[in-house]
């Protein structure tokens, strides 16, 4: 996201007021669209569909939460599957089940990362209903998680979980284009759970992204933070790189930031000219395996939520009888 857009959406730039009339028009359009799709086009399913999404543009930390929820479901002995749009995937035939040896360019960075971190089927399709039907037909899953897709109202859902960035929150509170909201903040009152990533607010649940040991990309060995006593290059192609940089600072690692657009497809030339050890996010690392070297590292993170969330989650009426 450009610095200029950030100033409008997350600051007090005068241009937001010029764009407000267009935001009201946008609200009318999306409200009408939602009503129509839910009433005439939504497909319901015989098993729980859990949607993990957001109401803002940009990264909020959904994917680590999807991974954690999938693991918790597996710990209950249940068969889980994940559906994703497969943003920027080069493949053209859908639905497609992600394979561990696929490239991020072929299937998308987030689906590939999820497939490698969880022993469950991950299926991509721009039309998510196609991915859901594939999982039901091919894998007989008992619960499906949709990574993003809150606004994909053709897909029925049993539970809606919205993630909010604790640093940027809802920005200036306006819908597109004056602000970062895909839907008005009143939408939060209609979902089942609101989770704040690295923060807290009344009526929400707090989530922390816990950094794990840094991993050398070429060998997959964990290394100590003590290895990085001098400056490194912090490379991030995610929606909110500041969160990644803040984590490195908390770990005591000195770095030069290198920010790229979200879902940037890294090429060797992006990193070869950097004359420093490179630490990147795990989401970015999956795009660099084909040209990994000893100077490339990544920092995995794990979503952690308190017991009160999990108690409320498993007590949800749509999950009764599933544990």
UniProtKB/Swiss-Prot annotation:
Key words of the record: ATP-binding, Kinase, Lipid A biosynthesis, Lipid biosynthesis, Lipid metabolism, Nucleotide-binding, Transferase
Catalyses which reaction(s): a lipid A disaccharide + ATP = a lipid IVA + ADP + H(+)
Any GO BP: lipid A biosynthetic process
Domain of life, per lineage: Bacteria
Record-linked Pfam families: LpxK
Pathway participation: Glycolipid biosynthesis; lipid IV(A) biosynthesis; lipid IV(A) from (3R)-3-hydroxytetradecanoyl-[acyl-carrier-protein] and UDP-N-acetyl-alpha-D-glucosamine: step 6/6
Enzyme class, UniProt record, top EC level: transferase
InterPro entries, per database record: LpxK, P-loop_NTPase
Sequence positions that bind ATP: 56-63
Enzyme Commission numbers on file: 2.7.1.130
Family: Belongs to the LpxK family.
Protein name: Tetraacyldisaccharide 4'-kinase
Organism: Legionella pneumophila subsp. pneumophila (strain Philadelphia 1 / ATCC 33152 / DSM 7513)
């Amino acid at each position: 996201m450009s610095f200029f857009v950030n100033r409008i959406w997350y600051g007090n730039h005068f241009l937001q007021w010029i764009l407000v009339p267009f935001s009201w028009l946008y609200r009318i359009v999306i409200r009408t669209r939602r009503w129509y799709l839910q009433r005439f086009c939504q497909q319901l399913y015989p098993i729980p569909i859990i949607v993990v999404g957001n109401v803002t543009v940009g990264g909020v930390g959904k994917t680590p939460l999807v991974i954690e929820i999938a693991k918790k479901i597996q710990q209950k002995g249940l068969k889980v599957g994940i559906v994703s749009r497969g943003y920027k995937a080069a493949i053209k035939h859908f639905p497609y089940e992600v394979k561990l040896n696929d490239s991020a360019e072929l299937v998308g960075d987030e689906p590939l990362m999820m497939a490698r971190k969880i022993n469950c089927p991950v299926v991509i399709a721009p039309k998510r209903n196609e991915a859901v039907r594939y999982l039901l037909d091919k894998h007989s899953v008992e619960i499906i998680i949709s990574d993003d897709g809150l606004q994909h109202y053709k897909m029925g859902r049993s539970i809606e979980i919205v993630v909010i960035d604790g640093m940027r929150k809802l920005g200036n509170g306006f819908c597109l284009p004056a602000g970062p909201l895909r839907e008005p903040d009143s939408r939060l009152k209609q979902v089942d759970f609101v989770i704040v990533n690295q923060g807290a607010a009344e009526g929400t649940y707090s989530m922390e992204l816990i950094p794990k040991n840094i991993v050398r990309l070429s060998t997959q060995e964990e290394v100590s933070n003590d290895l990085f006593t001098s400056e490194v290059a912090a490379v991030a192609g995610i929606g909110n790189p500041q969160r990644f940089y803040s984590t490195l600072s908390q770990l005591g690692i000195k770095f030069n930031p290198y920010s790229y657009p979200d879902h940037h497809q890294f090429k060797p030339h992006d990193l070869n000219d950097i004359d420093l050890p490179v630490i990147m996010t795990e989401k970015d690392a999956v795009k660099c395996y084909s040209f990994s070297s000893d100077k490339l590292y990544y920092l995995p993170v794990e979503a952690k939520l308190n017991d009160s969330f999990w108690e409320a989650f498993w007590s949800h009426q749509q999950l009764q009888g599933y544990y």
